[in-house]
Amino acid sequence: MSGEIRLGALCDHALVGQDGKVSLMGIFRNISVSGLPAQHPRMFLEAILGLDVGAHNVVVRLLRPDGQQSMPNPPEISVHAVAGQDVNVIVELNNMSFTTYGTHKFELTVDGEAVGSLPVSIVQMQPPGERRRAN
């Protein structure tokens, strides 16, 4: 089995139009939080995968900066790859909980084999009066 992430993003909203085109809105890599634990109400993970022809099982896991899994029930998606076409995977993630600062990774596996990851950094929000000034 071979597979790769050809395009991947975390965003506020994702959809596939009738023509098969993927639209992403509000792409981000950082989430600013006032403190921990923090909860992000809604986000979408979008990945365009290049896969071998046939049926596949895609699993999305959230890994903390220490490498430990953070999602108790990772989403599993069954997909079918057709010759000459990429596979669009869109996962809606609601009420994601973060208990540590740092770079987390959404790891994608296809049929049990890691094909790549999408990073998201959880950073502490600075109070308005403490913003850094450029020199």
PLM ranges: what are they?
Residues 2-135:
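Contiguous segments within soluble domain cores/interaction surfaces
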